[in-house]
Regions:
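N-terminal, active-site-proximal structural segment of metallo-dependent hydrolase catalytic domains
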Residues: 2-11, 15, 21-102, 113-116, ...
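Structured beta-strand-rich core segments of catalytic domains in phosphoester-bond hydrolases
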Residues: 73-169
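Surface-exposed cleft-lining segments at the edges of enzyme active sites
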Residues: 44-45, 134-137, 169, 173-194, ...
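Metal-dependent phosphoester-hydrolase catalytic domains
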Residues: 203-214, 220-324
Length: 324
């Protein structure tokens, strides 16, 4: 049996009851389980900035991930308001080294970005920045950017792609937002972003299907594998992004594959728009994977004044890989 995995499972079960109970840290014995934690934690963890991010850091420490992927990893607003910070007032991204250290991570890197919504990866392991992706003008702009990183765990190199696609119903930079939304311009633009990201990461590598790759982020798109829940028309453009991934890459949708026929929302409402994909060699090493609904993350509370949520409008995803 995998003793560290058992300890983690027991601790995670306890954490589901109450965040204050349990400890998901690894044992002191050699641990060959790579734990990856992803979360769009909303506006640079806006909800916990006034607390010095201490609640957030304590929550991360309980899960003891080896690698974290954060969407919306920059401070944007003043605490508990929707008033924008001046650039010099923003704690993140400049101080990610300090925040990561609070939960035991030594390394961090940022993806390419054009606006206030970058992704950041933090790790116990050295991070190689393969590429920072922002797309190309005029019509292949990757709005929130993306990143291709690489870490080595137990002698095995793992490629990590991070992303956060365009969120609106209308296309990026459209002149007529109403007309664009009526033509599903946002869905079509997200497809362009996904094509660009994949073609400049996993599709560039001839034998990527034999390597360890994962791709995580806020896709702002639904998958037709969840249509048993949505019950939309088969040609619905909201499926375009994940149709492309499923039909053109070797990626496997981890949550869908491990929980066939089930629906696991990743936002405060009822939509699954956050995903972690991985290639078969990595998928075969999964020992645990789930959307994290614990005492800290479940039932996000909307702040009526700002329309933001405590702690976030999204839920995290955690995956364990046995890397012996």
């Amino acid at each position: 049996m995998n003793t560290p995995k058992i300890l983690r499972t027991i601790a995670t079960a306890a954490l589901m009851v109450a965040v204050a109970v349990g400890c998901a840290s690894k044992s002191e014995a050699e641990d060959t389980t790579l734990r990856v934690l992803y979360w769009n934690f909303q506006n640079g963890m806006w909800s916990d900035e006034p607390n010095g991010y201490n609640n957030f850091a304590a929550w991360v420490r309980r899960y003891d991930p080896d690698v974290c992927i954060w969407c919306e990893a920059q401070t944007i607003y003043k605490p508990y308001t929707n008033e924008a910070c001046a650039p010099e007032e923003r704690y993140l991204v400049a101080n990610w080294d300090k925040l990561a250290a609070k939960y035991g991570h030594t390394y961090w890197a940022i993806g390419g970005h054009r606006d206030n919504y970058p992704q950041v990866i933090t790790s116990k392991l050295p991070i190689e920045v393969v590429s920072q992706i922002i797309g190309e003008e005029p019509d292949s702009v990757v709005t929130h950017g993306a990143g291709h990183f690489r870490v080595e765990f137990n002698g095995k190199k793992v490629n990590i792609v991070t992303l956060h696609t365009w969120p609106q119903k209308y296309a990026y930079r459209t002149k007529d937002k109403e007309a664009s939304a009526a033509e599903n311009g946002g869905d079509k633009y997200r497809l362009k972003e996904m094509e660009y990201i994949c073609k400049n990461t996993i599709e560039k590598v001839a034998d990527a299907d034999k390597e360890y790759w994962l791709m995580a982020g806020d896709y702002n798109s639904r998958s037709r594998v969840d249509n048993h829940f949505y019950k939309w028309e088969e040609n619905d453009t909201r499926f375009l992004v994940h149709d492309y991934i499923r039909n053109n890459t070797p990626y496997i949708d981890i949550i869908a594959e491990r929980f066939p026929g089930e629906f696991h929302t990743t936002i405060a409402g009822k939509s699954r728009i956050d995903f972690i994909y991985c290639t078969a060699p990595l998928y075969e090493r999964i020992v645990d994977a789930y959307v994290v609904n614990d005492a800290y993350t479940k039932d996000p509370v909307r702040d009526e004044k700002t329309n933001f949520h405590f702690p976030s409008d999204h839920l995290p995803i955690l995956v364990d890989y046995e890397m012996k």
